[in-house]
């Protein structure tokens, strides 16, 4: 499993999603180039400098998202699961 931060543009605002994918960085970029939606699983978020599981913030939703490739402005890969990396 690989971990990524994906920044998207929605109108004037931008948002960042962080989660895992079975795809490599190269495969992910290729999927975006082909206009395919990107799936991130095991979503996490940053709270006061600490990475936390999505479920601790919102238990109503499945911690997974499909991202429209037309909205993606940046993709960055984590070295490992961000919950295990030192600050």
Show where each model-derived region lies:
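Eukaryotic intrinsically disordered, low-complexity regulatory linkers and tails enriched in Ser/Thr/Pro
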Residues: 1-87
């Amino acid at each position: 499993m690989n971990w990524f931060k994906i920044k998207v543009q929605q109108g004037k605002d931008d948002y960042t999603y962080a989660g895992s994918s079975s795809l490599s960085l190269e495969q992910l970029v290729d999927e975006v180039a082909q206009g395919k939606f990107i799936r991130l699983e095991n979503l996490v978020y940053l709270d006061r400098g600490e990475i936390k599981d999505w479920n601790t913030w919102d238990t109503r939703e499945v911690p997974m998202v499909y991202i429209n490739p037309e909205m993606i402005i940046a993709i960055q890969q984590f070295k490992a699961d961000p919950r295990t990396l030192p600050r």
